[in-house]
Regions:
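C-terminal binding/interaction regions
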Residues: 1-55, 60-77, 82-159
């Protein structure tokens, strides 16, 4: 188990100094799901919700979330992201939208939080777009699938 790096000697929160870290290519992929009713899935597929195209809006929201992650998560650094790709897969059994975000940069710290934030905000946006027809949607299973680059090495989830 690694040590916690976001605390100073007094045990108080700090932003880690990354000045001396090597610049490397970083990539992280995160995923999550939002479970919806069959009726809501029909609306998503047919584009019949009053707020507009659910997946198009969620895609832009996820991209924006990754870009602004450092403003939301206190100890995250602002990063020069070089790529953000949000994809969706629709499933009818069970009814859900699967969300995946891949984020890349060349920098001194990883992009895991950016990928996780992108998935989270995309799911929240789907909820917002669909809440007029369903209130009991469930956002589930948000997780890091993989990361590469950096001192701690590569990671791949074991599913």
């Amino acid at each position: 188990m690694g040590e916690l790096t976001h605390f100073n000697k007094q045990g108080r929160a700090r932003m880690v100094d990354v000045t001396e870290k090597a610049v490397t290519h970083r990539r992280a992929v995160a995923a999550g799901e939002i479970r919806v009713s069959p009726e809501t899935m029909v609306h998503i597929k047919n584009g019949t919700l009053k707020k507009g195209d659910v997946l198009a809006v969620a895609q832009v929201a996820g991209i924006q979330a990754a870009k602004h992650n450092w403003e939301l998560i206190p100890m995250c650094h602002p990063l020069p992201l070089t790529g953000i790709d949000i994809t969706f897969a629709l499933s009818d059994s069970p009814c859900m939208v699967e969300i995946q975000a891949a984020v890349t940069c060349t920098g001194v710290t990883g992009v895991e939080m950016e990928a996780l934030t992108a998935v989270s905000v995309a799911a929240l946006t789907i909820y917002d777009m669909c809440k007029a027809v369903q209130k009991d949607m469930r956002i589930e299973n948000i997780r890091l699938l993989s990361k590469s680059g950096g001192k701690s090495g590569d990671y791949q989830i074991k599913e």
